[in-house]
């Protein structure tokens, strides 16, 4: 099993195998998840002071804030996995 990485903006990279969800930060439940993650010490702010546009939730209960749109992260994740498939074939 190889480690797949995805860029979440500004040179920050997350293991794609650990990502559970990539969501928009506007809804109240997601804001609550971010607050709880901050309280537990499981929040990683990768926005470099910019506006949070995506919240990445991992299987280890880490909450990662990104300044990149969720759709952009999804495309990067999909592009990376497509390139891996092409290398195998």
From Swiss-Prot:
Organism the protein comes from: Natranaerobius thermophilus (strain ATCC BAA-1301 / DSM 18059 / JW/NM-WN-LF)
Domain of life of the organism encoding this protein: Bacteria
InterPro entries per record: RemA-like
Protein name: Putative regulatory protein Nther_1328
Family, per entry: Belongs to the RemA family.
S-S bridge residues: none
Regions annotated as coiled coil: none
HAMAP family: RemA
Signal peptide segment: none
PANTHER family per record: REGULATORY PROTEIN SSL2874-RELATED, REGULATORY PROTEIN TM_1690-RELATED
